[in-house]
Every structure is written in C-alpha cells, then in structure tokens.
Amino acid sequence: MSILSFLLGEKKKTASVAKERLQIILAHERTASGAPADYLPALQRELVAVISKYVKIGNDDIKVNLERQDNLEVLEVKIEIPQA
C-alpha cells in the first residue's frame, strides 16, 4: 500500500453508497407505513441456526416479536435455553 492511498483512503463507489442509502430509506418507509415486519420469520430461523450450533434448541424455543408504540419500535427476542 502506498502512502498516498493510505492518506486518501479507499473511497466507496457512489453507486454502492447510493444503494445503501436507498435501502435504508425504503426500510424506514416500510416500517413507518405500519406494514408488518416480513423479516421476522427469517430472523427467527437464522437465530435458531446460530444458537443451535452451541446449544440444542428447537424452533419453538425462540420467539421474536416487534412492537410499535408512537415513534418507538421494540424488537423482543425470547430464547428458552434448556437446563444442562
């Protein structure tokens, strides 16, 4: 790595920055409209997959819930881990 590239740093391409910003705006618009969070089942499956690498759990041992009140969103994740 040259000193010049170190000082100036690697810049992200404007297209990728614009894409990231658009994704954030779209996600915000979806949640502001009161539409149900369609990512919750996928989040629950991924959590089961990750946690089951370390502890034996089933799909029913994890509950994921999203609550909206005024301008506040609360993502609640309940994980029941069996006694060892």
UniProtKB/Swiss-Prot annotation:
GO terms for biological process: cell division; regulation of division septum assembly. The keyword Cell cycle applies. Gene3D superfamilies: Cell division topological specificity factor MinE. SUPFAM superfamilies: Cell division protein MinE topological specificity domain (SSF55229). The keyword Cell division applies. Disulfide bonds: none annotated. Keywords: Cell cycle, Cell division. Prevents the cell division inhibition by proteins MinC and MinD at internal division sites while permitting inhibition at polar sites. This ensures cell division at the proper site by restricting the formation of a division septum at the midpoint of the long axis of the cell. Belongs to the MinE family. This is Cell division topological specificity factor. It comes from Ralstonia pickettii (strain 12J). The gene is minE.
